Regions:
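Immediate post-signal peptide segment of exported/extracytoplasmic ligand-binding proteins
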Residues: 56-73
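Short glycine/serine-rich loop segments
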Residues: 102-200
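Enzymes and membrane/adaptor proteins characterized by extended Gly/Ser/Thr/Asp/Glu-rich
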Residues: 68-106
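Long amphipathic alpha-helix in the N-terminal Rossmann-like dinucleotide-binding domain
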Residues: 47-54, 114-115, 124
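An N-terminal boundary/leader segment
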Residues: 1-51
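Short acidic-aromatic low-complexity motifs
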Residues: 15-16, 63, 77
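Conserved hydrophobic/aromatic pocket- or pore-lining residues that grip, position, or stack substrates
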Residues: 49, 71, 77, 110, ...
């Protein structure tokens, strides 16, 4: 994605871009067998994202009032609760835990603003490392010095929000949310050559 969120929102509002087309672009990047999608995402919502995008496109054609960012896909770190989804925190230990009963506040607000969640991103297990490696779900690699013929070669993406950062750097989502206590958003952003923000 080479557009800002503001630009994408304007394109959607004017009809020069459709939500379904945006979602399909993201899914194609995620599903690319030569890309980092399989190591950057723990779960991808193919059908749900498409259905939500179609609903946004339909509503826009009807002239209905929509939130500012309606139809823009985003990824979320596997540390945030989402109603009906298991929050694994990048660990196999929690894969059979009970699904979350509600959305995390930040996620609820992003959905209310119109974002479409396209999937949950890989992360350092329990957010406990700055490298971004994960023995269970693979190591998402930063965009620099990758070897497309050998997934064991390449630089780490930084952690703990590794998959979130790579989802942006590789065009798998135009927006993401990570978390940051001691650099878990800022470090992967720096490693991947993008911008990460930790609000104070």
């Amino acid at each position: 994605m080479t557009y800002s969120l503001k630009d994408l929102a304007a394109q959607l509002q004017t009809g020069s871009q459709g939500a379904r087309a945006l979602v399909e672009d993201c899914l194609a990047a995620i599903d690319d067998p030569n890309g980092e999608g399989q190591r950057s995402f723990i779960e991808v919502y193919h059908d749900r994202a498409r259905n939500e995008a179609d609903a946004v496109d339909h509503a826009r054609k009807q002239g209905w009032s929509l939130p500012a960012f309606a139809g823009i896909p985003m990824s979320i770190k596997d540390l945030f609760d989402e109603a009906g989804i298991v929050t694994r925190a990048g660990s196999k230990i929690l894969q059979n835990a009970a699904p979350a009963s509600s959305d995390a506040t930040v996620l609820a607000r992003l959905k209310a603003a119109g974002f479409i969640v396209i999937g949950r991103t890989n992360m350092t297990e329990f957010a406990f490392s700055g490298l971004g490696t994960n023995a269970h779900y693979g190591d998402a690699r930063c965009p620099f010095e990758r070897d497309p013929n050998d997934i064991t070669k390449g630089r780490v993406a930084g952690g703990s929000s590794s998959g979130s950062a790579v989802s942006i750097s590789d065009g798998m989502a135009p927006a993401t949310i990570g978390s940051d206590t001691g650099g878990s958003t800022r470090a992967p952003a720096a490693f991947c050559g993008i911008v990460g923000l930790k609000p104070t």
